[in-house]
Amino acid sequence: MDSWFILILFGSGLIHISANNTTTVSPSLGTTRLIKTSTTESAKEENKTSNSTSSVISLSVTPTFSPNLTLEPTYVTTVNSSHSDNGTKRAASTESGGTTISPNGTYGTWLTDNQFTDARTEPWEGNSSSAATTPETFPPADETPIIAVMVALSSLLVILFIIIVLYMLRFKKYKQAGSHSNSFRLSNGRTEDVEPQSVPLLARSPSTNRKYPPLPVDKLEEEINRRMADDNKLFREEFNALPACPIQATCEAASKEENKEKNRYVNLLPYDHSRVHLTPVEGVPDSDYINASFINGYQEKNKFIAAQGPKEETVNDFWRMIWEQNTATIVMVTNLKERKECKCAQYWPDQGCWPYGNVRVSVEDVTVLVDYTVRKFCIQQVGDVTNRKPQRLITQFHFTSWPDFGVPFTPIGMLKFLKKVKACNPQYAGAIVVHCSAGVGRTGTFVVIDAMLDMMHSERKVDVYGFVSRIRAQRCQMVQTDMQYVFIYQALLEHYLYGDTELEVTSLDTHLQKIYNKIPGTSNNGLEEEFKKLTSIKIQNDKMRTGYLPANMKKNRVLQIIPYEFNRVIIPVKRGEENTDYVNASFIDPYRQKDSYIASQGPLLHTTEDFWRMIWEWKSCSIVMLTELEERGQEKCAQYWPSDGLVSYGDITVELKKEEECESYTVRDLLVTNTRENKSRQIRQFHFHGWPEVGIPSDGKGMINIIAAVQKQQQQSGNHPITVHCSAGAGRTGTFCALSTVLECVKAEGILDVFQTVKTLRLQRPHMVQILEQYEFCYKVVQEYIDAFSDYANFK
């Protein structure tokens, strides 16, 4: 029921009660009460002896006011009866009865049972042979004091009612401001919607007491494991204990009618005390408003501006804010569209220059990487023909790996992304603008990770609960889900356990000298300790369901190497045949583009058709083979191509068109035809012969050459997945994928991170880079590449 309807009913009730209180007795009439009397048969004569009972009772009610009580009268009831032995009057004072509210609504003192018995329930004591009911009229009394008291009481009730109404008005305004509404309506991406959308908010925490103190970093892993038990039960409790928002905060500016269309979600609004104020535009009412809030960093006030993703109608305001706040860095943690819904308007041109209100934006450079894209913009105020006003360089870091649902699979990409943002933002610049769609969930997650990493370095402890509580006082619902909350802890643990392992190419020599030294107190050197950390990563066998199905077990060459569900390569099901969508292969994300590699086992004789169906379905034009068909007398891979002529594998026919021997590998050009579709494609196979049956290659030259040849082929054939296989699809396959990724990063940015590259691969497929020698080989090849960089300048 509507709260206003309830208030009206409540008010009506108060008025009704007040009316009853002030009209209980007419001032001009006495009070009449029916008293039942009884006499003996001989009592007709009034002057008989005391054996006759004359029960004429005189009962008067007179209000008596105590000087100490201003509002409540004390009633003294006097009962006159000739039945008394001495004929005197008996007075019933307040001491013999309890002060209550009488049935007619007036205050009074009720007599006890031995003082007064209602004639409606029991007759008077005595002979009941002749009972009569006689009306008795009390004399009129002056009721003016009663009326005055009741008027005063009514006034107090009315004042109380007004106070409640005013409180409810304030509560409703606060609720409209988005403090703790639980309703939601997801964005549908239509810019013409009349009403802004809303998103789900969490209920207010019933308690703000501090149950979650800061954690020392050496207790971090233990605590995270404890809280993640029982499906993150303790983490959910901690998250639900967070305060939603400060009760005193208001959102008056955001709630104005003129500003409603500027909000993407109706219940995610900036507080008045922390919102970003734009310079008002002359003649445009409320032009100082934008849905953005200042947010503190770890020890830096207003380090960030948390903003909603711009709408089409607020793009100009967004760039006005960037200019006025002297922002140099924009962090975008959403894609323009997710689940076919518009999450953010594209507020930059794809190329060239475009004016947005009074700010002109031109694109200077774009770098696309696997987890994020970096765009550099040059901005200048419009109308500056003389170029007197300086141009400014703005860098946008667009994190593209956040999934539509949940959080990233691993925090590694986010940590690398955050490091880039920290390194790029200049000292002189204003606040870093961070936005997702609503500007609270992913935005809050980014801000908290940044602050807690700073706290970790400064104090050797983290205070996630406390920091989230504080920034929620600046913008509601920062860190919006328990999954985001857990992801923050995972990112902090990742950084604590493994640190920053990224290197500048110029420091590789120093690093290699360091990792070959023995670690004091152990028999291992640094390299062995690094690899030991990699092998300690748990293999998640419970996430390999399809590969372990009985129908698919025989399709696996090595039972310890099964693809994970989340990234396994799926092929079309054969008509009328179940479990024919499985092949032992995994999509792998390298440096620049998602799913750039397919890491596959070497086909078995009975899975060769599935292998070619995979090649056709995913349009792979490059195959890298890192094993011989047979090694040490054991079959390592079925021959899946013809030595000459053509061979059919189901609907796929393969014809050898050309074979060329290079220094350490063979190139075969194959014409692959799908007879069902009547289409053909050219596919090139690179068969590497430089890997010995035991150990690793003696040098990295052959591997560098084949990687360069494959990259060149990719440029010509298009960016479709490169299929890489050895025998089991893990050891040599992982080494090739790791080296391709690291060398590409070296060439593009002059940095490398062998440890995290291999760690990421192992999270995508078990046992990638399988042995210590293969891990060491990665470092050696990178070192060779850097030493002879000029010789491989054409590596693209």
UniProtKB/Swiss-Prot annotation:
Record topology, Extracellular segments: 20-145
Residues spanning the signal sequence: 1-19
Lineage: superkingdom: Eukaryota
SMART domains, A to Z: PTPc (SM00194), PTPc_motif (SM00404)
Source species of the chain: Rattus norvegicus
Residue positions of the active site: 436, 726
Parts of the chain on the Cytoplasmic side: 170-796
Keywords in alphabetical order: Cell junction, Cell membrane, Glycoprotein, Hydrolase, Membrane, Phosphoprotein, Protein phosphatase, Repeat, Signal, Transmembrane, Transmembrane helix
Subunit structure: Part of a complex comprised of PTPRA, BCAR1, BCAR3 (via SH2 domain), and SRC. Within the complex, interacts (when phosphorylated on Tyr-792) with BCAR3 (via SH2 domain). Interacts with GRB2.
Chain intervals for the UniProt region annotation (Disordered): 78-107
EC number: 3.1.3.48
Catalytic activity of the protein: O-phospho-L-tyrosyl-[protein] + H2O = L-tyrosyl-[protein] + phosphate
Gene Ontology biological process terms, A to Z: insulin receptor signaling pathway; integrin-mediated signaling pathway; modulation of chemical synaptic transmission; oligodendrocyte differentiation; positive regulation of oligodendrocyte differentiation; regulation of focal adhesion assembly; signal transduction
Main location class: membrane
Glycosylation sites: 20-21, 47, 51, 68, 80, 86, 104, 127
Positions where Phosphotyrosine occurs in the chain: 792
Gene Ontology CC annotation, any one: Schaffer collateral - CA1 synapse
Protein name per UniProt: Receptor-type tyrosine-protein phosphatase alpha
Residues with PTM Phosphoserine: 205, 207
GO molecular function: protein tyrosine phosphatase activity; protein-containing complex binding
Lineage, highest ranks first: Eukaryota, Metazoa, Chordata, Craniata, Vertebrata
Protein family membership: Belongs to the protein-tyrosine phosphatase family. Receptor class 4 subfamily.
Pfam families: Y_phosphatase
